[in-house]
Swiss-Prot record, chain B:
A GO CC annotation given for this chain: dynein complex
Family, similarity comment: Belongs to the dynein light chain family.
One Pfam family per UniProt: Dynein_light
Compartments where found: Cytoplasm, Cytoskeleton, Cilium axoneme
Lineage: Eukaryota, Metazoa, Chordata, Craniata, Vertebrata
Keywords: Cell projection, Cilium, Cytoplasm, Cytoskeleton, Dynein, Microtubule, Motor protein
Record-given protein name: Dynein axonemal light chain 4
Recorded GO MF terms: identical protein binding; microtubule motor activity
SMART domains: Dynein_light (SM01375)
Annotated S-S bridges: none
Length: 701, 105
């Protein structure tokens, strides 16, 4: 506790105090710091107005330690002396103001006690209790604690309290003090009582709410392994070996590798043998396919070989066609058969050209080669963008197939080579036709340099000779067809020609240079390879386009033509009028001489019928007249005799090829007479036909 | 003679086996490559302190691919762990170290 005592004694209290209040600040300023501050006098409104003399009047005030109010004349009865005596010593102490402070020196006993209490409180009591506790509680708390305090400290405190005069007064402030101290933070920082204030407010706590959901944990798996030096080493060695191997492989792949050449070779050979394996399989597959087909078509094969129509004997002069195999392929569906050709070497193999005769419905083309041994699937298949219109196989090189396309191109396929594209092909640069190529034919004889060559005829009026020189096709225009009498003179002296559209041609069997050309106008020209501007002869053969023209295989003078005007005509090329005319009541698509007799030929018509003639038997009508395709809608387009077997193949515009066997009557040889050997050979055949022709000639002349 | 060869072999081995060799991994390609590179970097940086290397890998992986990665690096140890699928990489490095990195939270 601190105690402040002030004694003020003045001679003139009333004025003196006022004066002092008024001037206390300025007096000091005047005396010491006059230079630093300008004098400003603030006067209260009720200040006494004093004259200068009054103001200058000095008042002397003396501050003494004597209490002016202290009684000077205290008389007390002295029992010792038995009289009243004046007491000289008077207590001068007067208390004007007393305030109990709440600051306690740390070192003091009370301070130490307080610290101790705080520690105890923090250790044992919960802070909440401390906050909530009353002052009385605290007082109560305090006293037992004080009692607990050491006896020494208590004794000291009691002795110490002698010094403090207002101990009793201080009790009042104790609660305040006690209230404050427990609240102090634990670091014992005593709060400044003068400007410390405390505020608190209570807010609502937000409500708590639980919300949860469950989800699948991320999938886990177990993994275990052991790592140690030898395993790591092994793994690395393995990896290195692998790397080396791959390097070696890369080396082997490059053909330059020399050292590893042997290895590479071995690998290569193994690779080759692998590919060989595939071909071996294909070979085996082919054999199996043949075997299956042989089983499936056994009856047909038996018919082909042995069946002879017994009824022919009784029919007399009439024959029939026995259908054998039917060849067709899904890829060539709806593509008309536009060309047929037997292979000159393999008598069971024939080529079929697919395209379209319909000007409005041109699409792709196909070249298929079938064997009678395998009627179910073609041996070779080639596709082309443009329809095939004609084809021919080479006599001496039976693997070379020349085809003519609708777009005017000619191309040569080599069956020996596995590629699907033609080996040779004409281009617009190398003189291809500008119109469909209607017929192609290999020349029997090679030219002087032994280069292969073939001819082609097209609607553009050109007949072109193509020569295979090394790896390209060289073309030569042999002749340009001009319609006779169509030449018109134009003022400049130039001549304009209407070109004839060639549709068919055939070389003479013996006279090398001579050939026949049939045209769309119905005319047939006899031409020579040497004269490109002149025809040797012109026949007004037909009223419509000539579909086929062919020389008799035996008789050098005789040829035959057929046309869409329903007729087939047989000619002697030396005579401008036909020898025989047969009207077949439908457009004739193709005619073919038989290879075994000079007088037998076959014609096919678009009404689906095949007609076989033997002039030796019947000069006037066909000895066989038979529909050979299933539907009437099917038009037969082509016919070909097999060179040795008594069979024909017939193609229709649905893409089917039918093989038919000629009955005995259709291939009747001259009857054997008793004791006479039947003569055979070309001479007999020529004589036979000549005999017939003579009959006609006689009639005509 | 044999000894020198042996030494030479060892040197060769050390020289050759610096590449990381992934023994097992079900990570996606991109992640695997990144982790592999990280492992190589860490093992090279702390070539003589596997602990630090593992710490570096773990902390980087945590940052890159989310928390709870675990890394074991050592020359010889066996383990059986449970890991989140597509989050495991077990590789050999430097010819002597095995590093297993996996995630499991």
């Amino acid at each position: 506790c601190l105690l402040f005592l002030f004694f003020f004694q003045s001679l003139n209290m009333g004025r003196g105090t006022r004066k002092r209040d008024e001037d206390s600040g300025t007096e000091v300023g005047e005396g010491t710091d006059e230079w630093s501050q300008s004098k400003t006098t603030v006067r209260p409104p009720d200040q006494l107005e004093l004259t200068d003399a009054e103001l200058k009047e000095e008042f002397t005030r003396i501050l003494t330690a004597n209490n002016p109010h202290a009684p000077q004349n205290i008389v007390r009865y002295s029992f010792k002396e038995g009289t009243y005596k004046l007491i000289g010593f008077v207590n001068q102490l007067a208390v004007h103001f007393s305030q109990v402070g709440n600051l306690i020196p740390k070192d003091s006993d009370e301070g130490r006690r307080q610290n101790y209490r705080d520690e105890m409180a923090a250790g044992s009591q919960e802070s909440v209790k401390v906050v909530l506790s009353d002052t009385e509680n605290l007082e109560e708390d305090e006293e037992p604690k004080e009692a607990e305090a050491e006896a020494e400290a208590e004794a000291e405190a009691e002795t110490g309290s002698q010094i403090d005069v207002p101990t009793v007064e201080a009790v009042e402030t104790v609660p305040e003090e006690e209230l404050m101290t427990p609240r102090q933070p634990k670091e014992r920082k005593l709060t400044n009582k003068f400007n410390f204030s405390e505020r608190a407010s209570q807010t609502f706590n937000n409500l708590l709410r639980d919300r949860d959901c469950q989800m699948e944990p991320p999938p886990r798996t177990n993994f275990s392994a052991t790592a140690n030096q030898w395993e790591i080493y092994d793994a690395y060695m393995e990896e290195l070996e692998k790397q080396e191997k791959t390097k070696e492989k890369e080396k082997a792949k490059t053909p330059v590798a020399k050292k590893s050449g042997k290895m590479a070779m071995r690998k290569l050979t193994s690779m080759e043998s692998q590919s060989d394996d595939i071909t071996k399989v294909t070979q085996a597959a082919k054999i199996v396919e043949r075997m299956v087909n042989q089983n499936t078509y056994d009856d047909v094969a038996q018919d082909f070989k042995y069946y002879e129509d017994a009824a022919d004997e009784y029919r007399d002069q009439e024959g029939t066609l026995l259908p054998l195999w039917k060849f067709q392929n899904d890829k060539a569906k709806h593509l008309a058969v536009t060309a047929l050709c037997w292979n000159p070497k393999y008598k069971d193999l024939f080529a079929v050209g697919h395209g379209s005769y319909d000007f409005m419905k041109q699409s792709r083309g196909m070249l298929l080669l079938y064997s009678m041994k395998n009627p179910s699937f073609p041996e070779y298949t080639f596709s082309s963008d443009s329809g095939i219109m004609c084809l021919d196989m080479h006599m001496d090189h039976p693997y070379l197939v020349v085809v003519g396309h609708y777009d005017g191109n000619v191309a040569i396929y080599n069956l020996k080579k596995p590629q699907t594209q033609p080996s040779f092909r004409s281009t617009a640069k190398s003189g291809k036709h500008t119109d469909p190529v209607w017929q192609v034919k290999w020349e029997k004889y090679d030219d002087m340099d032994h280069n292969l060559n073939f001819f082609s005829v097209s609607s553009d009026g050109r007949i072109v000779s193509w020569t295979l020189v090394k790896s390209e096709l060289v073309h030569t225009d042999v002749i340009k067809l001009k319609v006779e009498g169509s030449t018109t003179e134009v003022p400049e002296g130039l001549q304009l020609h209407t070109v004839g559209c060639g549709t068919a041609f055939d070389f003479h069997k013996e006279i090398n240079y001579m050939f026949l050309v049939g045209t769309e106008e119905g005319k047939i020209y006899k031409c020579s390879k040497s004269y490109s501007s002149q025809f040797l002869d012109t026949y007004d053969a037909h009223n419509m386009a000539v579909d086929a023209v062919t020389w008799n295989p035996y008789h050098a003078k005789v040829f035959m033509s057929c046309s869409s005007d329903w007729t087939v005509k047989i000619w002697d090329h030396t005579i401008k009028t036909p020898m025989f005319i047969y009207d077949l009541n439908s457009a004739v698509g193709d005619v073919a001489w038989s290879p075994y007799s000079s007088t037998v030929f076959a014609a096919v018509t678009t009404d689906g019928k095949a007609h076989v003639f033997d002039l030796a038997v019947n000069k006037y009508e066909a000895i066989c007249n038979q529909p050979v395709v299933a539907k009437k809608k099917n038009k037969i387009t082509h016919v070909q005799f097999n060179p040795i077997y008594p069979i024909i193949i017939i193609g229709d515009d649905r893409g089917h090829v039918t093989c038919l066997k000629l009955s005995p009557n259709l291939r009747k040889m001259p009857k054997e007479k008793k004791g006479q050997e039947v003569q055979k050979g070309p001479a007999v055949e020529i004589a036979k036909l000549d005999k017939l022709l003579n009959l006609v000639r006689e009639v005509k002349t | 003679m044999g000894e020198t060869e042996g030494k030479k072999d060892e040197a060769d081995y050390k020289r050759l086996q610096t590449f990381p060799l992934v023994r097992h991994s079900d990570m996606p390609e991109e992640m695997r490559v990144e982790t592999m590179e990280l492992c190589v970097t860490a093992c090279e940086k702390f070539s003589n302190n596997n602990e630090s290397a593992a710490k570096m890998i773990k902390e980087t992986m945590d940052k890159k691919f989310g928390s709870s990665w675990h890394v074991v690096i050592g020359e010889g140890f066996g383990f059986e762990i449970t890991h989140e699928v597509k989050n495991l990489l077990y590789l050999y490095f430097g010819g002597t170290l095995a590093v297993c990195v996996w995630k499991c939270s």
